[in-house]
């Protein structure tokens, strides 16, 4: 779950309102903590996996992502704290940081298509990803094969995140 009021993404970051900042963090970061709190009693007998989605703008500036980048950074930190605290119940918490996906919503973002093309050509695998690759990663992280993975941010972006600026 992620959201920031559109004006907070359109205006310069320094113009972020207190209300917009709060909304973005509440919906995009705190929602994971609230969900994990409610899921823990249901999961602690048999363990399990909690996943969330993030974006590399949590680590580097992506123009017009603004307060959502701050929220994603908070989300990633929450993943680590939840992984630490829930680990004793064999509950793993991880995040998938996906590259730009060609969705209807994404295509509505100004400049998305050219940005996606640039990322695909700059990625080590020289391509973009698709939804099935994110789904496959989620399936892996929820499976027994990932039983020793927790507190991690798993990049699914054809390697783009390893590239310099």
Regions found by a protein language model. Give the residues of each.
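Catalytic loop of short-chain dehydrogenase/reductase
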Residues: 3-37, 44-88, 100-102, 160
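Short, small/polar-rich loop/turn modules that mediate ligand/substrate recognition or access, typified
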Residues: 87, 92, 149-151
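A glycine/serine/threonine-rich, flexible loop-to-helix segment
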Residues: 88, 98-123, 133, 163-165
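Conserved SDR Rossmann-fold cofactor-binding beta-strand/turn motif
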Residues: 92-102, 142-145, 155-157
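A conserved structural motif in NAD(P)-dependent oxidoreductases
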Residues: 123-134, 145
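Short C-terminal tail/terminal secondary-structure segment
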Residues: 138-139, 150-165
């Amino acid at each position: 779950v992620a959201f920031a009021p559109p004006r907070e993404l359109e205006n310069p970051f320094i113009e972020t309102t207190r209300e917009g900042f709060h909304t973005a963090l509440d919906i995009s970061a705190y929602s994971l903590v609230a969900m994990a709190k409610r899921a823990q009693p249901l999961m602690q007998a048999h363990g399990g996996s909690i996943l969330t989605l993030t974006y590399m703008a949590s680590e580097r500036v992506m123009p017009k992502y603004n307060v959502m980048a701050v929220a994603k950074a908070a989300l990633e930190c929450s993943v680590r704290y939840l992984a630490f605290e829930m680990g004793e119940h064999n509950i793993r918490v991880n995040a998938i940081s996906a590259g730009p996906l060609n969705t209807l919503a994404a295509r509505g973002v100004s400049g998305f298509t050219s940005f996606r093309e640039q990322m695909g050509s700059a990625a080590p695998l020289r391509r973009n990803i698709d939804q099935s690759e994110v789904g496959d990663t989620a399936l892996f992280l929820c499976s027994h094969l990932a039983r020793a993975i927790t507190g991690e941010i798993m990049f699914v972006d054809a390697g783009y995140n390893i590239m310099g600026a």
